[in-house]
Amino acid sequence: MSKKPLYVAHPWHSPTLTQDNYESLCCYIEITPYDSVKFELDKATGLLKVDRPQKFSNFCPCLYGLLPQTYCGTASGNYSGEQTRREGIQGDKDPLDVCVLTEKNIHHGNILLQARPIGGLRIIDSGEADDKIIAVLEDDLVFAEIEDISDCPGTVLDMIQHYFLTYKATPNHLIKGSPAKIEIVGIYGKKEAQKVIQLAHEDYLSYIGDTAEVN
């Protein structure tokens, strides 16, 4: 009997991002609203690792993870700079982040799911583009009817924005009103989200090509 080597698919590289021109997306979930620890994908190994305990009272209000086969590089940074009219904006050199809305209770990450993009948050984090795509779980009984972020309940968007604006802030920074490192400079709809995803996908293909040439 032949022995086959063990192989675990890498969540960043192995899944196909989309098969229908960014209408439906494969999403890798890292953390859930039930996690008191922030997990993130270790890009080198493909394993889910502990990044840090969630600070203070902040808990992510939705499923949160990344889009496989995306990378926020040159094209993503340049586009963010164009849209915000700021110079020197770079991609954060990470996969594109995604927030997935669902009414179901999903208690653990390290899973793949299919979701539809409805929009996104244009975020600048310490001078780098760090957009968050907002998507809805396919066939969700509540959120699946949402086609665009303009249809999303304002309270849901408020919770998501509040999390990203405060999850790195200390009480001292908030009390003193110190300048925020994270800025939400815009909210956009489905078509713009698909553009952002496409650019991150193109950045990924360039990044993988450059990495292969170096190796």
From Swiss-Prot:
GO terms for biological process: phosphate-containing compound metabolic process. InterPro entries: Pyrophosphatase, Pyrophosphatase_sf. GO terms for cellular component: cytoplasm. CDD domains: pyrophosphatase. GO terms for molecular function: inorganic diphosphate phosphatase activity; magnesium ion binding. It is found in: Cytoplasm. Keywords: Cytoplasm, Hydrolase, Magnesium, Metal-binding. Its cofactor is Mg(2+). Mg(2+) 2 binds at residue 97. It catalyses: diphosphate + H2O = 2 phosphate + H(+). Its EC number is 3.6.1.1. Its main location: cytoplasm. It comes from the Bacteria. Pfam families: Pyrophosphatase. Catalyzes the hydrolysis of inorganic pyrophosphate (PPi) forming two phosphate ions. PANTHER family: INORGANIC PYROPHOSPHATASE. Homohexamer. Belongs to the PPase family. This is Inorganic pyrophosphatase. The lineage of its organism: Bacteria, Pseudomonadati, Chlamydiota, Chlamydiia, Chlamydiales. The gene is ppa.
